[in-house]
């Protein structure tokens, strides 16, 4: 049911993290991050080149979604309730939901999770316990999606935070067209990448971002 809803452009949100209710949402305007025009801000560009963090995928899905569900400064409430956590853990076990995790000195410093269907990736939420950790996770997600021939990165809603990376807003009808094309694409979500491929994917992303910016 949940996978089918996403394929139709609908996603679940709870009114609050402690709520037993889940609403199904289909915004009139949809936020997306164009994979071929992803912008890497200057400070994040420097951080990515320093390789100070270890990047993992799907090593601790539950820890990531639990961290995303917790209140944080400026955001005392979240929309991830127990039902959503349970469903996404099941989707992860089935191979549909994934994490990109940023680790530092053996600790989970930040990350994100989302759902992969065909060539569409639906970004759900991210968190950060260290400076720029969630941004690093996002950059590594985009690098992986580009390498895996994904066509769409759905951000659900356009936010000021995402706009710095090139996020845009499109009408629902246009989004559904993009979604249909993406679902038919032959794409692969790459989890663990060899260090040289990881570096190459990030280098390609930084080069593309620099070219697009200029």
Predicted regions and their residues:
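N-acyltransferase acceptor-side catalytic subdomain
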Residues: 1-214
């Amino acid at each position: 049911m949940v996978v089918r809803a996403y394929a139709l452009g609908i996603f679940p949100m709870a009114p609050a993290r402690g709520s037993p209710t889940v609403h199904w949402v289909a915004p009139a305007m949809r936020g997306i991050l164009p994979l071929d025009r992803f912008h890497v801000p200057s400070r994040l560009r420097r951080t990515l080149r320093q390789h100070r963090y270890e990047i993992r995928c799907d090593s601790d899905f539950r820890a990531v979604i639990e961290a995303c569900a917790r209140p944080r400064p400026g955001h005392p409430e979240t929309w991830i309730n127990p039902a959503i956590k349970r469903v996404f853990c099941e989707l992860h076990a089935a191979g549909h939901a994934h994490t990109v995790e940023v680790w530092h000195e053996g600790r989970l410093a930040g990350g994100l999770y989302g759902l992969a269907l065909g060539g569409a990736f639906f970004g759900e939420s991210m968190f950060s316990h260290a400076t720029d950790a969630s941004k690093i996770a996002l950059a590594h997600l985009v690098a992986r999606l580009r390498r895996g021939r994904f066509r769409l990165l759905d951000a659900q809603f356009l936010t000021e935070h995402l706009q710095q990376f090139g996020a845009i807003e499109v009408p629902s009808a246009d989004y559904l067209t993009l979604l249909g094309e993406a679902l038919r694409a032959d794409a692969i979500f790459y989890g663990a990448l060899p260090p040289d491929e990881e570096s190459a994917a990030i280098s390609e992303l930084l080069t593309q971002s620099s070219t697009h910016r200029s």
